[in-house]
Amino acid sequence: RTAAALIRMAAERVDNRVVQDPRVFAERLRMVSRKLIRITGGIRPMPGKRHVAALCGTTGVGKTTTVAKLAARFALQEHLRVALLTLDTYRIAATEQLRVYADIIGVPLKVAAAPDEAAAILDEFGDRDLVLVDTAGSSQFNLEQLRDLQALLTAVRPDETILVMAANTPVEDLRVVAARFSVLSPASIIFTKLDETRRYGGMLDFLLERGIPLAYCCTGQNVPDDIELATPGLIAGLMTEGSTNRE
């Protein structure tokens, strides 16, 4: 529904001859998506000034793998001083998975189980350009878990909190998740699992309704490759061809 509406809006802005030119029409579609769907430009740490970004979301959406992708990008490609902090003490396997990635990337990883412990670790990471915080998956229906997570993030005081959601989630569930996780004041969204669906209308509907900016899209499990910065071209590609490889 959303994709069709945006395509119609793009078509209304050009005459029939221009619509026949796919390159021109794609540019018009990018312009329309830029106006209607907000994007953030991604995490933007400044060298020499610590930036803390925390990822939160429900179970199984790929937060830990996404943290690893971001860590690899910023540490290996942008040559920033990165550190990892995990607040997920429920899943030992997830912590060990992140530890393997941290060792490969060459960044420190610490685990915190309590608010005061998390705050102390953040002090240790004071010389880092970017601290990425992984959190335990919380059910949108488990208010106690959300309160515990809120207490941990209050101690961490992230510069930005990002809500991670799966693109193959029904739009009704996306709405409920966003409403429940709003207590954490997420500044943006990362959508994962774009490789597991070709129906992006619900995701786009959600972004239009909530007005919350999109930061990244993840398209698979490969670290660090399967993550794309959200751009108008990427969104236009999702609407037309189901492709995320757009500049």
Regions found by a protein language model. Give the residues of each.
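Conserved ATPase-coupling elements of RecA-like P-loop NTPase cores
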Residues: 94-96, 140-146, 173-175, 200-202
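Phosphate/Mg2+-binding loops and adjacent switch elements
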Residues: 156-177
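Conserved beta-strand/loop subsegment of P-loop NTPase cores
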Residues: 81-83, 133, 158-165, 182-224
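NTP-binding/hydrolysis catalytic cores, primarily Walker-type P-loop NTPases
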Residues: 1, 204-247
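Primarily NTPase-proximal linker/entry elements flanking Walker-type ATP/GTP-binding cores
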Residues: 1-82, 86-89, 100-107, 111-114
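Switch II (G3) loop of P-loop NTPases
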Residues: 56-59, 78, 82-93, 101-148, ...
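Short, solvent-exposed amphipathic alpha-helical segments in soluble enzyme
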Residues: 70, 99-102, 149-150, 178-182, ...
